[in-house]
From Swiss-Prot:
Residues 1-49, 61-81, 147-180, 225-262, 292-333, 345-381 are annotated as: Disordered. The keyword Cell membrane applies. Expressed in heart, liver, brain and kidney (at protein level). This is SH2 domain-containing adapter protein B. Phosphorylated upon PDGFRA, PDGFRB, TCR, IL2 receptor, FGFR1 or VEGFR2 activation. It is a peripheral membrane protein. The modification Phosphoserine is found at S101, S301, S311, S382. The SH2 domain preferentially binds phosphopeptides with the consensus sequence Y-[TVI]-X-L and mediates interaction with PDGFRA, PDGFRB, FGRFR1, IL2RB, IL2RG, CD3Z and CRK/CrKII. The keyword Cell membrane applies. It comes from Mus musculus (Mouse). Induction: Up-regulated by okadaic acid and genistein. Its main location: cytoplasm. Residues 301-311 have a biased composition (Polar residues). Residues 244-256, 313-328 have a biased composition (Basic and acidic residues).
C-alpha cells in the first residue's frame, strides 16, 4: 500500500514529479463562430421581417452587416451560454462592440445608404424623426445596432438581457444634434412675443427640447400673469451647435427695466466707485478739518467778544480733567502719549508749591518739541530721552525733610520696605559702613540693589561714573529723568519714592 501511494502521489522523489501543466484552451467556441460567419445571412432578414413588416431592405442590410451572437448548442447549457453572452455585452469594446456609438453610426450610414434609393418613404428618402417619436416611429428606430445584432440569441434564451447601451433607442442620421437635458438656455421673455405653433405649455416655467419644422427649439413657458402661455424660440444654427452657442435676439431687445436681484461684479464695482467719489466731493465741499478743534461743537463763526468768551469757556470745560497740556497743542492729537503715574508715596507739604509751578511733563514736552511744531528724533541712548518721568523731587529742600529719606535703617529693613513696591521704587538711608556717606536702595526686576552715595571734596557721587553734585537731593532729582550709571541698572531710573511711614 505504501509503495502504491508513493508511486501514485510521487512522494519523496522530486525527479518523477512533473511540472504543473497549463489548462488546455477550448477552441470549440471559436470554431463555432467561424462556421457561423461562413453561413449565408438569409435567416436574419426573415426574423426581422417576422417581427416588423415595414422594415424592408434597409433592415435586412443593417442586420446582415452587424452580425449576431452565436447560437450555442450541444454540450453547453443555456445558463452558460446566457452568461457568456451577457459577459460579452458587459465587457464590450467601446469602439467596435455591438453597443458602441461608432458601430451605431456605421449602421445608420448603412441604413441611409441602403434605403435612400427606395421609394418606400413618401418624402423621397427623407424621414423626420422627433425626440418623442424616435422609439415608436418605424422599425429602424426600434431595432438599434446592438439590438438587431443579438435578436436571434436573445429570443432563444430567457436569461439574456439587454445592456444599458442597447436599451436606448438609436437616433437616425436625419435627426439634428440633441443636447443633454441638463444643458439648457435661459431665454429672455418679451411681452410682445407671440405664441409659436410648436405647442402649448402650462404650469410655471419649464424647459423642454421640441422640434418644429425640422428645427430644434428650446421653449420656456412664461409666467401665467402675462395671460396666455408665450414661448420664445432660439434656433440652433447647425448640427454641431451647443446650447451656449445659440444667440437670442430678444436679449438685446430687452431693456434694463428688469431687475432680477443680481448684478455683475463690474457693475457693482463701478457703482461703489461712483458712490465713493460722491462722498469725497461732498466732504470736500464741507471743508472741515478733523483735528483743528476736536472738542468744539460745530457752529457758526464768532461775531462778538462775548460769544468768543462763551466759546472759550465751553472749550475749556470740555477738556479732559487729567490733561495738563495747553489748548494750542490739540493740532496733533495722535501725539498724546503721556502716561499718568500714580503717586505711591504720601503727599508732602509742598502741594501748593507743586501746583503753582509748571508741570515737569509739560516742560519736558515743550523742550522735546522742535520750533516747527514737530518732535526731534531722540535716540534711546541719549541723556535727553526718558520713556517715563519719575516723580518730581525739589532739590532745594534739605535731605532731612525729603519724604524718601529714611535715616539710619538697616539693609534688611530697606528691602522689607521695597518688597511690596513696584519696580524702580527707591529710598535713601544712612550708610552702615561710613559715617558721612549715604546708600541708595532700589528695587529692580532682578531683586534689590544698594548703591553708595559717597562724599568726596564737598561733592556727592553716585557710584563711580556719575558727575559730582552739591547735595543728595540734587543727585536724586537728576536721576529721576535719566538712566542710572550703575552696572546692572542701566535701564532704570528713580521713579517711585518710598515715603516714610509715620505712626
Amino acid at each position: 500500500m505504501a509503495k502504491w501511494l508513493n508511486k501514485y502521489f510521487s512522494l519523496g522523489n522530486s525527479k518523477t514529479k512533473s511540472p504543473p501543466q497549463p489548462p488546455r484552451p477550448d477552441y470549440r467556441e471559436q470554431r463555432r463562430r467561424g462556421e457561423r460567419r461562413e453561413q449565408p445571412p438569409q435567416a436574419v432578414p426573415q426574423a426581422c421581417s417576422a417581427s416588423s413588416a415595414s422594415c424592408g431592405s434597409a433592415a435586412a442590410c443593417f442586420s446582415a452587416s452587424s452580425g449576431s451572437l452565436p447560437d450555442d448548442s450541444g454540450s453547453t447549457s443555456d445558463l452558460i451560454r446566457a452568461y457568456r453572452a451577457q459577459k460579452e455585452r458587459d465587457f464590450e469594446d467601446p469602439y467596435n462592440g455591438p453597443g458602441s456609438s461608432l458601430r451605431k453610426l456605421r449602421a445608420m450610414c448603412r441604413l441611409d445608404y441602403c434605403g435612400g434609393g427606395g421609394g418606400g418613404d413618401p418624402g423621397g428618402g427623407q424621414r423626420a424623426f422627433t425626440a418623442a417619436a424616435g422609439a415608436a416611429g418605424c422599425c429602424c428606430a426600434a431595432a438599434g445596432a446592438g439590438a438587431a445584432a443579438s435578436s436571434s440569441s436573445s429570443s432563444g434564451s430567457p436569461h439574456l438581457y439587454r445592456s444599458s447601451s442597447e436599451r436606448r433607442p438609436t437616433t437616425p442620421a436625419e435627426v439634428r444634434y440633441i443636447s443633454p437635458k441638463h444643458r439648457l438656455i435661459k431665454v429672455e421673455s418679451a411681452s410682445a412675443a407671440g405664441d409659436p405653433p410648436g405647442g402649448v405649455c402650462s404650469g410655471g416655467r419649464t424647459w423642454s427640447p421640441t422640434t418644429c419644422g425640422g428645427k430644434k427649439l428650446l421653449n420656456k413657458c412664461s409666467a401665467e400673469e402675462t395671460g396666455a402661455g408665450q414661448k420664445d424660440k432660439v434656433t440652433i444654427a447647425d448640427d454641431y451647435s451647443d446650447p451656449f452657442d445659440a444667440k437670442s435676439d430678444l436679449k438685446s431687445k430687452a431693456g434694463k427695466g428688469e431687475s432680477a436681484g443680481y448684478m455683475e461684479p463690474y457693475e457693482a464695482q463701478r457703482i461703489m466707485t461712483e458712490f465713493q467719489r460722491q462722498e469725497s466731493v461732498r466732504s470736500q465741499h464741507k471743508g472741515i478739518q478733523l483735528y483743528d478743534t476736536p472738542y468744539e461743537p460745530e457752529g457758526q463763526s464768532v461775531d462778538s467778544d462775548s460769544e468768543s468768551t462763551v466759546s472759550l469757556r465751553l472749550r475749556e470745560s470740555k477738556l479732559p480733567q487729567d490733561d495738563d497740556r495747553p489748548a494750542d497743542e490739540y493740532d496733533q492729537p495722535w501725539e498724546w502719549n503721556r502716561v499718568t503715574i500714580p503717586a505711591l508715596a504720601a503727599q508732602f507739604n509742598g502741594n501748593e508749591k507743586r501746583q503753582s509751578s509748571p508741570s515737569p511733563s509739560r516742560d519736558r514736552r515743550r523742550q522735546l518739541r522742535a520750533p516747527g511744531g514737530g518732535f526731534k528724533p531722540i535716540k534711546h541712548g541719549s541723556p535727553e530721552f526718558c520713556g517715563i518721568l519719575g516723580e518730581r523731587v525739589d532739590p532745594t529742600i534739605p535731605l532731612e525733610k525729603q519724604i524718601w529719606y529714611h535715616g539710619a535703617i538697616s539693609r534688611s529693613d530697606a528691602e522689607n520696605l521695597l518688597r511690596l513696591c513696584k519696580e524702580c521704587s527707591y529710598l535713601v538711608r544712612n550708610s552702615q559702613t561710613s559715617k558721612h556717606d549715604y546708600s541708595l536702595s532700589l528695587k529692580s526686576n532682578q531683586g534689590f540693589m544698594h548703591m553708595k552715595l559717597a562724599k568726596t571734596k564737598e561733592k556727592y557721587v553716585l557710584g563711580q561714573n556719575s558727575p559730582p553734585f552739591d547735595s543728595v537731593p540734587e543727585v536724586i532729582h537728576y536721576y529721576t529723568t535719566r538712566k542710572l550709571p550703575i552696572k546692572g541698572a542701566e535701564h532704570l531710573s528713580l521713579l517711585y519714592p518710598v515715603a516714610v511711614r509715620t505712626l
